[in-house]
Amino acid sequence: MMTTRRHILCVWLFINSSIFIKRAAAFSTAAKQQAVIPPGILGPPEPLKSLQVGQTLNAFRLVVDDDDDRVDFSIERVANSPHIFLLRNFLTSSECNQIQALAEEGGMKTAETVTKGDTSSRKNCSVAWIPSSGPDGSSLVSGLVASTVNIFLSDVVKSRPSAGVENMQILKYGVGGEFVHHQDGDARVFTVIYYINGVGGTWFPLADRNDGEIPKNKAGVLELVENLEPGKHGIFLKGDSSNSAQEGNNNKHTVLVNKGDAVAFYNYRDEGSAQLDWAALHCGSPTDETKWIANHWYRLNELANY
């Protein structure tokens, strides 16, 4: 019964999410006006909120410019703190190839972080940006935004004037490429990482940590994770096609991902403090093969005031 209800919900909201996408084209200046962030809106809405680790919901999204009218996928909770969900088969193989082609056609540059000129935090990596909406955007990309917004953002967040989505970031990592530990933050309330060629390596070292408190600042968490290891601590999303994919997979800390899968997670605490959730600290581990991923960041700009 839950599955049927989810299907109906996805279709209706997909059609009505265009309001969010249009607003995303230019973030509202209303973000500068501090507003109260009540508890229970920065995390997952129902029925995702009640999903237990290991439990799965079936869903679908509508497809634009494709012979098929929908893509069926599943949503599995893989961690409670932070809220992390794995979307199995969210993208078709054809859509993955299309995203990769969009990046190559548009030209790729050496990737930087939010700090202009910083190429040391992200190594051996090229980047391209694809508009998430507007006349220069891709119908595939805007469709992914619509589907994701519908499922993962609360009605309150979607209705806020300062809500929006950044352009899709497409990344190509060469052998040895990596991205050091970081928290997406900066008013990015929610993140989706798409696995374009099935090479994973996303590690959340503090996910579902039950061994002491997590510090509430960057310096503290970076010191804490120094002695932790992927596959032994936190949650490690590992490419099923990786050369080392068969090593150390039979434990609760490792989740295998394939081409077309995506991981979705929340970056802020949801108890009313509107503070960063440092359990969402993550990194892109050094890769032993070429790795293609794409990112979408969903913003609530008023969070910058807290």
Predicted features and spans:
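Classical eukaryotic N-terminal signal peptides for Sec-dependent ER targeting/secretion
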Residues: 1-10
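Fe(II)/2-oxoglutarate oxygenase catalytic core
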Residues: 9, 14-16, 20-23, 27-306
